[in-house]
Amino acid sequence: MNNYEGIFSKETMVLVRNRMTAFFYKHFCKPIFFRYDPENVHDYMTTVGRILGSNFLTKKLTRAFLGYTNPILEQDILGIHFKNPIGLAAGFDKDALLTDILPDVGFGFEEVGSITGEPCEGNSRPRLWRLPKSESLVVYYGLKNRGCVEISSRLRGGKFRFPIGISIAKTNCSATAEIDAGIADYFKAYDTFVGIGDYYTINISCPNAFGGEPFNDKEKLEKLLSKLETIPADKPVFLKISPDLSERELDDVLEVVSRHNISGFVCANLTKKRGESGKIMDNDVPEKGGISGRAVEELSNKFIADIYKKTRGKYIIIGVGGIFTAEDAYKKIRLGASLLQLITEMVFKGPQVISEIHQGLVILLRRDGFKNISEAIGVDNRFS
């Protein structure tokens, strides 16, 4: 009887299910998807996700094929309960259309957007490219979204089954390139979303917007955060930073943030670097756009470690970039990340990768004697 219990245990069944799904994605779905323009595939999968999230039966079936939970992964952070540590990063669900299905896919939370003060069509196409050898994407969307008014009206009063983060950025247009106008745009979007979602992220690091990334400058960042703080904060606020900051620029950001009501950091956004990381294996790489996936992994890990150590663990860190396996995720956690986000990994590995990573994390945590994931945060990066 015990042998049968082992064969048919929940963990074994999930492992077998994930391997079957991964095989099917690798040999059937991925070859088809990779024949088509990646933005068209993204839009198609968004439509599929909306359909799957539209009724109880399809949500239940999705959960049966992709879901995974384990108490060892649950955390309460900043008054928010997270069933799983991996969330969907901003940039995929730009208009918050997938909130009904993502919990069943296995995500512990999601960050919608980035959302701007005005509707934005983004940059001209093509604006998304795959780098298969590098397991990376080149992204040049330019903050495409339907704007804060439309998206907030749809989300307001909604009952969500997992935490929702609202990523705020400035509209990608020439008008917001002027600092005061850019701040006013952030302010409009931030103010519009008061009372909606569980946390906010101020995205100051989009590499594809008109005017660049002016708020990496400490005087301009000070001005932005001071203006936003005139709105009474009813939720935790994170700052999403670039992985391309110099150490001095990072120190400047930390200095400014220390004077404001910021709860943590999202580390990190897309990198503009092409060959410096040594992770770009593809020959034909577009010059425009930022890069996600493996190419940003080491940069992200360095920022997680630096921020955790420099601030003595004061801030909650959400780690993003190059999380393809449980070992990748575990490394970020042990360096100081409390939560994680991904997008690119689903493109190359399939949707079951979320469950694979979560199940693998449980194995790694138990191997090292941890009773909860929170005990592993920063253990490889202790400050004196």
PLM feature segments, named:
Residues 95-104, 245-259, 309, 313, ...:
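Catalytic cores of alpha/beta
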Residues 79-87, 161-166, 231-245, 309-319:
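Short beta-strand/loop segments at the ligand-binding rim of alpha/beta enzyme cores
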Residues 172-186, 214, 239-259:
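Active-site glycine- and acidic-residue-rich loops that bind
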Residues 16-75, 136-144, 148-149:
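An N-cap/entry alpha-helix motif that binds or orients negatively charged groups
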Residues 113-163:
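A gly/proline- and charged-residue-enriched helix-loop-helix capping module
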Residues 59-68, 204-217, 255-313:
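Glycine/Thr-rich beta-alpha phosphate-binding loop at enzyme active sites
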Residues 108-120, 264-272, 322-323, 329-356:
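Glycine-rich phosphate-binding active-site loops on the catalytic face of alpha/beta enzymes
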Residues 122-135, 275-289, 346-370:
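C-terminal helical cap(s) of enzyme catalytic domains, especially alpha/beta-barrels
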